[in-house]
Amino acid sequence: MASPNRTIRRKEITELARQTWLRIWSEQMPKDWRVYLVRKTVIQRAHGRSVCGVLLRRDKRILVGRHTKHYSFQTLVHELAHLRTLNEPVDHGPIWDYQFNRVARPLLGSELQTDI
């Protein structure tokens, strides 16, 4: 039987996430979180067809789907904004909207439209 890491074919991109976080918010990303680039089907089987990235609170892990119709760097930043607003009770609430659309998006601009 293939190892779970092999079947998921994940690629750790935590360092890229940490560098991006530091550029946006000028503080350290929480140390115990890991970020992985995975096949989109891994995410979509568990969370629905329209989901490209997911934040797994219990595992302290962020999964970003590759080969989706959305740019993977934008999905990464989208999920980092969720991590930044972890205590907000609403999924895409006003604090998340501010962090993603008013802080991260203007700073990164067209760089968001790239693939990892």
For each of these PLM feature ranges, what is it?
Residues 1-74, 83-116:
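Active-site-proximal or metal-binding-adjacent scaffold patches in catalytic folds
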Residues 79:
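Walker B catalytic acidic pair
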